[in-house]
UniProtKB/Swiss-Prot annotation:
Record key words, sorted: Acetylcholine receptor inhibiting toxin, Disulfide bond, Ion channel impairing toxin, Neurotoxin, Postsynaptic neurotoxin, Secreted, Signal, Toxin
Pfam families: Toxin_cobra-type (PF21947)
Single GO molecular function: acetylcholine receptor inhibitor activity
Keyword field contains Secreted: yes
Protein name as catalogued: Short neurotoxin 6
Cited SUPFAM superfamilies: Snake toxin-like
């Protein structure tokens, strides 16, 4: 009986979604914890009018368009 109970507990633990959330760098500084449906960290360059590009970073549900986007799916991978 103890073996059956232990087996059920182990199966339950393995099947649970433990609510992992991704952490990405954000645009200006620091980090942001992504919403559960945001599974991509991104970094992209946004051209500016006077030649200086702006680096945009954050969380997304898909890889955004733009100039030279870099997309990844592990914590803090968009440095």
């Amino acid at each position: 009986m103890k073996t059956l109970l232990l087996t059920l507990v182990m199966v339950t633990i393995m099947c649970l979604d433990l609510g992992y959330t991704l952490t990405c760098y954000k645009s200006l500084s620091g980090t942001v914890v992504c919403k559960p449906h945001e599974t991509i960290c991104y970094r992209r360059l946004i051209p500016a009018t006077h030649g200086n590009a702006i680096i945009d970073r954050g969380c997304s549900t898909s890889c955004p368009g733009g100039n030279r986007p870099v997309c990844c799916s592990t914590d803090l991978c968009n440095k």
